Amino acid sequence: MTTTELVALLHLASPALPIGAFSYSQGFEAALDANLIRDADTARDWIAGGLTDVLAHGELPFLAHQLARWHAHDADALARENAWFVASRESAELRRETEQMGWSLAQLCTSLEWGDTARRATLATISPIALPTAFAYAAAAHDASADAVLAAYAFGWVENQTSAALKAVPLGQLAGQRIIVALRGAIDAAVRRALATPPDAVNTFAPQLGILSARHETQYSRLFRS
C-alpha cells in the first residue's frame, strides 16, 4: 500500500468525514435502554458481538463485493446488489441511516471529483445508495486494496460505536480506548472472514438488532438517530 492510499483510507475512516456517522448508534442506545449494556465490559462485549456476528457476515463481505464491482464497473450488479442491501435493513431507522450516510458520501465523492467520469455517472444513477456501496466507490477511486478497505470500514464502525458508548453509558476516554485496543484482533478476524465469503453467502440476518432498532423508534429519551 502506498502512502497516498493509506491517507485516503484514513480520511474515509475519520470521524471528521461529513456524513453524519456521529448521530447514529446502530442499536447501541436501545440495547442500553434494555439493560443489555451497563458498563465498560458489557459495552465492549456488545460492540464485539456486532463486529463478529453482524458486520463480518453481512456488511463487510457486501462491501468487498461492491468494491470489486466498482473496479469492474459492473453497473447492473452494483445497482441490483445495492437495492438488495437497502431492502435488507430491518427497521426504518437502519434504512434511513444507510441511505443518508450513503447519499452524503456519494455527494462528497462527486464534489471532490473522485473517480473517473464514467464511474461518477454510474454513481449518480444509484438511488437510494447504501453506505457500503458509496464507501466502496470512494475506496475504488483511490485504488485501495480490499483488505485495507474493509479494515478501515470496520475500524471506523468500532470507533463510532465506542464514541456512542462514551456518550450514552457514559464511559471515560480511557475506557473507550481500552475497548478499541481490545477489538483490534477481532477487526482482523472479521476482515479475513469477510474476504472469504462468496456473494451468495452474504448474510445480514440480525433479529436482535432489528428488534432493538424498531424499539428505538419509539424510545422515550434518545441521543441518537438509530
Curated annotation (Swiss-Prot):
UniProt entry tagged with the keyword Secreted: no
Cellular localization per UniProt: Cytoplasm
Disulphide-bridged cysteine pairs: none
Keyword Ribosomal protein applies: no
Coiled coil (UniProt feature): none
Pfam families assigned: UreF (PF01730)
GO cellular component, one term: cytoplasm
One term of GO molecular function: nickel cation binding
Keywords assigned: Chaperone, Cytoplasm, Nickel insertion
Subunit structure: UreD, UreF and UreG form a complex that acts as a GTP-hydrolysis-dependent molecular chaperone, activating the urease apoprotein by helping to assemble the nickel containing metallocenter of UreC. The UreE protein probably delivers the nickel.
Family: Belongs to the UreF family.
Function of the protein: Required for maturation of urease via the functional incorporation of the urease nickel metallocenter.
Protein name as annotated: Urease accessory protein UreF
Organism, scientific name: Burkholderia ambifaria (strain ATCC BAA-244 / DSM 16087 / CCUG 44356 / LMG 19182 / AMMD) (Burkholderia cepacia (strain AMMD))
